[in-house]
């Protein structure tokens, strides 16, 4: 491609709303243009990157035995009602009506549609296993779209769905797709981790996220540098304490703590470590009849509640945070001074493992501006009704596999694989005849990759102060040739054109910048766009018999003889 015949429109400044590097740089490089909140036009450079990602994904899906199809963006509500997700999915599911007032959705995912296809197309075990995939536009009505393509409302994903006759076969399909995902992200040249994850609204019994490592990631990844253990923060298990609880050494005392409504303030006021305090979190579970059931969850003052773990406890499915009215009714006190001792009304008490092991702790006294000091289980209050892992792990916690301490880093989720089992096939009655001629329910897996999110994630991991630094595999162009003096020197033009044609003939995706721009402007623009390798052809260099090769990741350019320019460019590309 020649720049004079292409659309390049870079910007000096990013829009004020662009908070992270990928959003800023994609906008400045002319890759995307905002149409509405969370909705973008992919400009030519941006679309080229997307198509290259899709190409790698498609190759690996095909190699793994998956078969491509294309399912519609608009889906009938009846399928979502049949699966039960019409009500479960929430406000992110964009619901629309046609002219006949029939309900439809703009698909955020395609489990219902693919299961409907399976129940109509698969009749016999002889047709199994099967794995279908598509690369399609999705829509999720995010409350607060932000970060450009990272959390948009309209985006592109690859979804694959496997169908097997039994659980063992479904596990094999899961493992095949897991391995395919490993290959995809390796080919994309991204630093990533596969981590055990919660199944969320998709459901199923097992899942892994593929997380691109980036400081701006919204997810926290927990891993053990000394082993293969890795999980996201939602699933990472905080270890049980092995040491016995210490015997009480203090008497229970109600102490004044005026204005100290947070554990940090209480600890500072009393001159105690934050880890000696207990925070009280009040949840409510609505009942079919009568008032909501109220629960008191207790965590150490320096720990944070893991809502996913809490929601999996018996009786806490579908919980919400209690209202102030419910809190006052059950504790006789407003939030800030709540505790498990002498509540106004009975509540269910769940203690985190660390809290259940504490002695002489500080907790709210259910009286404004007062806390108890020297509180002890069994003496001052009953043992907790339930002891469970309620908290997020922290850096340095012992690894659940017993092989060292945990580390935590941030990541961007770009892929997710799920072992669904029969969640959707049972709901939609997707069955087949087994080898005994009897009906059996299909075993399923589903596997997603965020194609457009990968674009942003790759930039977050590969950029500097000057712009994007694309991995070669997904760069919009692999090489840019920058002739200095294009309009003045026939030798420069002829040399640049000859190299351009030679690279094209060898299948290199190359751009020739024939716009006759000033060198500084031209170089800065291509550094912003992030092409991995720049070849500079100038009259001064040609007089010395050389051209310059400048890898985007490297500080220094290399001079190579003109007659070796093609070979050296190809050799340099192979190293990128």
Curated annotation (Swiss-Prot):
Keywords: Aminoacyl-tRNA synthetase, ATP-binding, Cytoplasm, Ligase, Nucleotide-binding, Protein biosynthesis. It is an enzyme of class 6 (ligase). Its main location: cytoplasm. Catalyzes the attachment of proline to tRNA(Pro) in a two-step reaction: proline is first activated by ATP to form Pro-AMP and then transferred to the acceptor end of tRNA(Pro). As ProRS can inadvertently accommodate and process non-cognate amino acids such as alanine and cysteine, to avoid such errors it has two additional distinct editing activities against alanine. One activity is designated as 'pretransfer' editing and involves the tRNA(Pro)-independent hydrolysis of activated Ala-AMP. Consists of three domains: the N-terminal catalytic domain, the editing domain and the C-terminal anticodon-binding domain. Its EC number is 6.1.1.15. Gene3D superfamilies: Anticodon-binding domain (3.40.50.800), Bira Bifunctional Protein, Domain 2 (3.30.930.10), YbaK/aminoacyl-tRNA synthetase-associated domain (3.90.960.10). This is Proline--tRNA ligase. GO terms for cellular component: cytosol. It comes from Bordetella parapertussis (strain 12822 / ATCC BAA-587 / NCTC 13253).
């Amino acid at each position: 491609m020649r720049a004079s015949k292409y659309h390049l429109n870079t910007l000096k400044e990013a829009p004020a709303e662009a908070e992270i590097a990928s959003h800023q740089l994609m906008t400045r490089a002319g890759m995307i243009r905002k149409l509405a909140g969370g909705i973008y036009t992919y400009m030519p450079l941006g679309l080229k990157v997307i198509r290259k990602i899709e190409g790698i994904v498609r190759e690996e899906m095909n190699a793994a035995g998956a078969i491509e199809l294309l399912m519609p963006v608009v889906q009938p509500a009846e399928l979502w009602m049949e699966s039960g997700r019409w009500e479960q999915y929430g406000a992110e599911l964009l619901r629309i009506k046609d002219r006949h007032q029939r309900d439809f959705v703009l698909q955020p995912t395609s489990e219902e549609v693919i299961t409907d296809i399976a129940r109509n197309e698969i009749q016999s075990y002889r047709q199994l296993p099967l794995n279908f995939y598509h690369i399609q536009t999705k829509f999720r009505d995010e409350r607060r779209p932000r970060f450009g393509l990272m959390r948009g409302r309209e985006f592109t994903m690859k979804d694959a769905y496997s169908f097997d006759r039994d659980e063992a076969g479904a596990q094999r399909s899961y493992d095949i797709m897991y391995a395919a995902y490993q290959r995809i992200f390796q080919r994309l040249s991204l630093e990533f981790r596969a981590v055990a994850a919660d199944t969320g609204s998709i459901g199923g019994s097992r899942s892994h996220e593929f997380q691109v490592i980036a400081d701006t990631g919204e997810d926290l990844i927990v891993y053990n540098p000394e082993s293969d253990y890795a999980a996201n923060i939602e699933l990472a298990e905080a270890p049980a304490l092995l040491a016995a609880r210490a015997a009480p050494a203090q008497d229970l005392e109600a102490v004044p703590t005026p204005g100290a409504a947070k554990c940090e303030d209480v600890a500072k006021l009393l001159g105690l470590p934050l880890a000696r305090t207990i925070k009280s979190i009040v949840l409510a579970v609505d009942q079919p009849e009568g008032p909501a059931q109220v629960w008191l969850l207790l965590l150490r003052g320096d720990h944070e509640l893991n809502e996913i773990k809490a929601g999996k406890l018996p009786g806490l499915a579908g919980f919400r945070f209690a209202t102030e009215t419910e809190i006052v009714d059950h504790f006789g006190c407003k939030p800030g001074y709540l505790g498990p001792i002498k509540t106004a009304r009975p509540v269910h008490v769940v203690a985190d493992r660390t809290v259940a092991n504490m002695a002489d702790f500080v907790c709210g006294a259910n009286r404004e501006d007062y806390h108890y000091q020297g509180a002890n289980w069994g003496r001052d209050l009953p043992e907790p009704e339930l002891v469970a892992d309620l908290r997020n792990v922290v850096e340095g916690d012992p690894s659940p596999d017993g092989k060292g301490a945990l580390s935590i880093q941030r990541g961007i989720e770009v892929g997710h694989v799920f072992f669904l089992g029969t969640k959707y096939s049972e709901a939609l009655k997707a069955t087949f005849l087994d080898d005994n001629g009897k009906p059996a329910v299909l075993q399923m897996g589903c596997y997603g990759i965020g194609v457009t999110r990968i674009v942003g994630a790759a930039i977050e991991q590969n950029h500097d102060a000057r712009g994007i630094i694309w991995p070669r595999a997904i760069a919009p162009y692999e090489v840019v040739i920058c002739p200095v003096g294009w309009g003045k020197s026939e030798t420069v033009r002829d040399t640049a054109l000859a190299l351009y044609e030679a690279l094209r003939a060898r299948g290199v995706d190359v751009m020739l910048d024939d716009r006759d721009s000033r060198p500084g402007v031209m170089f800065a623009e291509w550094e912003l766009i992030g092409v991995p390798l720049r070849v500079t052809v100038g009259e001064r260099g040609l007089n010395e018999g050389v051209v310059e090769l400048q890898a985007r990741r490297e500080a220094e350019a290399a001079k190579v003889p003109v007659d070796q320019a093609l070979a050296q460019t190809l050799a340099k590309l192979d190293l990128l």
